[in-house]
Amino acid sequence: MAQPALKVVDMPPVDKDKSKAIDAALSQIERAFGKGSIMRLGKSDKVQEVETVSTGSLGLDIALGVGGLPRGRVIEIYGPESSGKTTLALHTIAEAQKKGGVCAFVDAEHALDPVYARKLGVNLDDLLISQPDTGEQALEITDTLVRSGAIDVLVVDSVAALTPRAEIEGEMGESQPGLQARLMSQALRKLTGSISRSNCMVIFINQIRMKIGVMYGSPETTTGGNALKFYASVRLDIRRISTLKDRDEAIGNQVRVKVVKNKVAPPFKQVEFDIMFGEGVSKVGELIDLGVKAGIVEKSGAWFSYNSQRLGQGRENSKGFLRDNPKIAAEIEGSIRQNSGLVAEKILENAAPTADDLDEGEA
């Protein structure tokens, strides 16, 4: 049986009457809801340009595709315990403060260490902090701060600690399923519009739980239901992959961050970097690793060199050399930024998405 041929129908050009009707509708909408409530996409500079805040990690900024975390969006950072979630959020706050931004930290876990935050570069005098008693109180405070339009970065640590008032007032062991998920869903419905209008970045730190009875696929899931997965523009999965030691003493962790979801650039890139105890993200360690990937730093056996100058034997010695020679470190960083496209390609080569990543990214 012969297949019918596909017929391509050309749309007629927009006539003058249609154009007048569109303009009249646009002006009516703007009178009713305010200027900027509707616009042509190509004429809006705000829509085309994505403002970002650095994460404090050069590799992660490159992996995100736009040079950092986007402002005016919801961000989720999740992972196991002691993997570096709060450290990454505090680095982002420090970078925003360096550019004159106002930041807030909603400490639902009541566990923020101000001494450690100061070591990461956070200006504690200008940081707004709240330690709410209930999940409703935490999200009301978040909503008020976002609506003020004066906050640049706001961190909620963590979603798992946003305990509904009914659960706190109830008996220990009393089952109240779905309370936290409904709380998060309602809060995000309210917050999303305010976040976009105020251009405030809201980072939700989240924990991991295990789903019972899962036979196939990953049994891991995040707390607070599915709403955050859908509303988040960027989701970062951070994992500790090894412990860094100086002889027998642990001095830090090597972590891997995967961009599980990204609405502003291609997702599924991953990057590895060191988080040193009492110091945070090791920038000199990243310069060596990314420099090797970009072909800027040469590695021959155990030796690392840059422009025919030896940096040191072994990675730790090379890190020490760059720490003592900030000018050379700045040169390497500049070269890496100029070759960020090549570095991003190398990062993408090493991070093929899994079936679980694809499921998460579709949210």
Curated annotation (Swiss-Prot):
Superkingdom per UniProt: Bacteria
CDD domains the record matches: RecA
Keywords, ordered alphabetically: ATP-binding, Cytoplasm, DNA damage, DNA recombination, DNA repair, DNA-binding, Nucleotide-binding, SOS response
S-S bridge residues: none
Binding, ATP: G79, P80, E81, S82, S83, G84, K85, T86
Location within or outside the cell: Cytoplasm
GO molecular function, one term: ATP hydrolysis activity
Pfam families attached to this UniProt entry: RecA, RecA_C
GO CC terms of this entry: cytosol
Stored Gene3D superfamilies: P-loop containing nucleotide triphosphate hydrolases
Record-level GO BP terms: DNA recombination; DNA repair; SOS response
Homology family: Belongs to the RecA family.
Matching PANTHER family: MITOCHONDRIAL DNA REPAIR PROTEIN RECA HOMOLOG-RELATED, RECA
Reported function: Can catalyze the hydrolysis of ATP in the presence of single-stranded DNA, the ATP-dependent uptake of single-stranded DNA by duplex DNA, and the ATP-dependent hybridization of homologous single-stranded DNAs. It interacts with LexA causing its activation and leading to its autocatalytic cleavage.
Name used for this protein in its record: Protein RecA
